[in-house]
Amino acid sequence: MQLTELIETTVTGLGYELVDLERTGRGMLCIYIDQPAGISLDDCEKVTRQLQHVLTVENIDYERLEVSSPGLDRPLKKLADFERFAGSEVSVTLKKPLDGRKTYRGILHAPNGETIGLEFERNKGEAAMLDFTLADIDKARLIPQVDFRSRK
């Protein structure tokens, strides 16, 4: 079983989604997890303990294990991510330029089959729609929406 498969099986078995996995040259293993209700420190601790056990049993070499939430600007990698975050503001970078542009920022539309839609502003207030597939994407991330106004 490959490392990604092993980690994904463990994480999903605990009721979480594996968002991303990074392995650095210095032996650090970074795991990003999520769930609809969000991730707490207790969730990260629970997954860390289970992964430490699994990685030891499977004799996987690593120096340090870090488990965290993907953050406010979480990456979107699977079609399910694009479905879940439809209506959110995102930044999408395409592998190849379209109309002389690779990076787009706009409102994500729910996928229609394999096609994902992004409503963006082309020229001073002129709305346009970009249609693309997962294969077209170099990277896609949520744009953090933070409200610093106090609630009264």
Swiss-Prot record:
Function, in words: Required for maturation of 30S ribosomal subunits.
Listed Pfam families: DUF150_C, RimP_N
Keyword list, A-Z: Cytoplasm, Ribosome biogenesis
InterPro entries per UniProt: Ribosome_maturation_RimP, RimP_C, RimP_C_sf, RimP_N, RimP_N_sf
Gene3D superfamilies hit by this protein: Ribosome maturation factor RimP, C-terminal domain, RimP-like superfamily, N-terminal
Localization per Swiss-Prot or TrEMBL: Cytoplasm
Superkingdom assignment: Bacteria
GO cellular component, one term: cytosol
GO BP annotations, alphabetical order: ribosomal small subunit assembly; translation
Protein name per Swiss-Prot or TrEMBL: Ribosome maturation factor RimP
Sequence similarity: Belongs to the RimP family.
GN (gene name): rimP
